[in-house]
């Protein structure tokens, strides 16, 4: 399943009274937005498309960069909701990036094999702040500073800021999404998008392929 919704919906499978040692596996999850995950009663094993493996323990906060594709294994360790997830929209992300940019002291030190997933242990204050950002109708300024606080706990702060900066750039997939969302009553075909963008259908497909995406008429 190639969607960040898979990870959000995975919470439905573990609602209610779940005994420990339950395991859930999802393949090729794409995060179309940056996400912060709070692991409450679970351990998350992440495998990236380049073969890297990241083991994230319970009582941790994890940040995942936009457009990251991963396989996940969730080991549920106790009863109740094992984790919560918060997706950061692009407007909020841009503001967070501006706040944290001064922390990027040596941008040239960040190599091509930079990290896209970050995590840190969460204390009581962190869990309370995470709960606040997931509440309804939180003012944007509070979201920005609360998320910034959580992200500032990461050890490799310069790599994190670089990741935030990369994620603020709009992808071709996002541009297509905005066009489609401008008129949801329309059954969009590839030829329609080609007309709007003044591009050939072949060019659109190639750009999507570069982002590991496709368009199904």
What are these model-derived regions, one by one?
Residues 1-10:
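A short, N-terminal "cap"/entry segment at the start of jelly-roll beta-barrel domains
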Residues 9-108:
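N-terminal regulatory/effector-sensing and dimerization cores
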Residues 12-16, 37-39, 63, 90-93, ...:
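Non-catalytic effector/regulatory segments
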Residues 102-127:
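Aromatic/histidine-rich interaction motifs
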Residues 130-133:
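Acidic, glycine-rich flexible loop segments
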Residues 202:
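Key DNA-contact positions within bacterial/archaeal DNA-binding proteins
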């Amino acid at each position: 399943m190639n969607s960040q919704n898979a990870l959000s919906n995975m919470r439905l499978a573990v609602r209610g009274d779940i005994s420990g040692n339950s395991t859930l596996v999802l393949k090729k999850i794409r995060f179309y937005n940056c996400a912060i995950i709070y692991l409450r009663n679970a351990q998350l094993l992440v495998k990236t498309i380049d073969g890297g493996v990241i083991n994230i323990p319970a009582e941790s906060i994890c940040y995942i960069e936009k457009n990251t594709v991963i396989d996940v294994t969730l080991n549920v360790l106790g009863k109740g909701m094992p984790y919560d997830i918060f997706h950061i929209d692009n407007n909020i992300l841009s503001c967070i990036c501006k706040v944290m940019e001064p922390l990027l002291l040596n941008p040239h030190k960040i190599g091509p094999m930079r990290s896209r997933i970050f995590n840190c242990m969460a204390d009581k204050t962190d869990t309370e702040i995470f709960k606040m950002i997931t509440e309804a109708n939180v003012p944007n300024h509070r979201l920005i500073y609360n998320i910034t606080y959580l992200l500032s706990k990461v050890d490799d702060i310069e790599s994190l800021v670089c990741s935030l900066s990369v994620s603020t750039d709009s992808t071709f997939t996002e541009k297509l999404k905005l066009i489609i969302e401008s008129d949801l009553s329309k059954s969009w075909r590839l030829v329609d998008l080609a007309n709007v963008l003044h591009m050939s259908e072949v060019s659109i497909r190639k750009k999507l392929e570069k982002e590991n995406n496709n368009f199904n008429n």
